[in-house]
Amino acid sequence: MGLLSKKLLVASMVAAVLAVAAVELCSAIPMEDKDLESEEALWDLYERWQSAHRVRRHHAEKHRRFGTFKSNAHFIHSHNKRGDHPYRLHLNRFGDMDQAEFRATFVGDLRRDTPAKPPSVPGFMYAALNVSDLPPSVDWRQKGAVTGVKDQGKCGSCWAFSTVVSVEGINAIRTGSLVSLSEQELIDCDTADNDGCQGGLMDNAFEYIKNNGGLITEAAYPYRAARGTCNVARAAQNSPVVVHIDGHQDVPANSEEDLARAVANQPVSVAVEASGKAFMFYSEGVFTGDCGTELDHGVAVVGYGVAEDGKAYWTVKNSWGPSWGEQGYIRVEKDSGASGGLCGIAMEASYPVKTYNKPMPRRALGAWESQ
């Protein structure tokens, strides 16, 4: 198992089992033809959906949203009933949101008004690897390099979550210790080139982590789903450890082969177009679209594989909580033939570089003293 301990793997598996159990309890809402046959049946379905997802709407808002809920329910049921795609949809917590609200709240948070920071580590370290020599499947969750699924809430912080997945991963690979890191520090403190809940870019976040000496733990600086004052110095008093990186590299754009080279060695941050209805209500299976390449959401690729029907896929960790998709993950079709990969997954991929094999003690990082 190399540097990653068996204890880490067992702990990750236990956490995953508990998360799956919790998801099944809160979000399993069957939908049949009879649920859509009349207004009364649809109202009953809407009430069951609200109860399952613990959504409370006042009377006027409920009536305003009911039309959207009906449209979404018909879209989901029609897709699943046709059965002409290898993935299914379900009525998740976005059930009574229209596309405009969904985009404004949960996607569209990759900042485009400032350029991404150039890589501080030149080149592409995995370029010499032969694709034919790569393992047929990779899953960094099974190797203990991925923390549990998190939830960004109503904050445009996907860029921070995507960044953290990759940094947590390479740190676990290098040190054998899986440490949950703080997205909130990035939201509050990485303000020169990123903009908290209003969006940001993963490349900029990697450079912030490098230039400021590391990233503190989630336990010391927990997530609040809102931008606040940078309190990293105070949080450091409760955290003797900060995770350091040497910088980042970009995966050559639009190359799924190069993305595979990188993912075979570590989790990788990517951007995708996630604002479509099919992505919004994804439940299970290999996602084959519809989606374009208007990149609006940061996620992380933590593996790849081949489904039973022979379709290759990327394993993607999202930040919409464990009740979305496959316990918080989506399998996106790999090698689809689309330029830049399906949903643009290979267009803007990057990953942190870490050679220092131990988490750094906070007291060793003089750069933080001025925070």
From Swiss-Prot:
- Disulfide connectivity for this sequence is 155-197, 189-230, 291-343
What is this protein identified as? Cysteine proteinase EP-B 1
Glycosylated sites:
130
- E.C. number: 3.4.22.-
In alphabetical order, the GO MF annotations are: cysteine-type peptidase activity
* Description of what induces expression: Synthesized by the aleurone cells stimulated by gibberellic acid (GA). Repressed by abscisic acid (ABA).
Tell me which CDD domains the record gives: Peptidase_C1A (cd02248)
**Which residues belong to the signal peptide in this entry?**
1-28
The uppermost taxa in this organism's lineage are: Eukaryota, Viridiplantae, Streptophyta, Embryophyta, Tracheophyta
- Sorted alphabetically, which PROSITE patterns does this protein's record hold? THIOL_PROTEASE_ASN, THIOL_PROTEASE_CYS, THIOL_PROTEASE_HIS
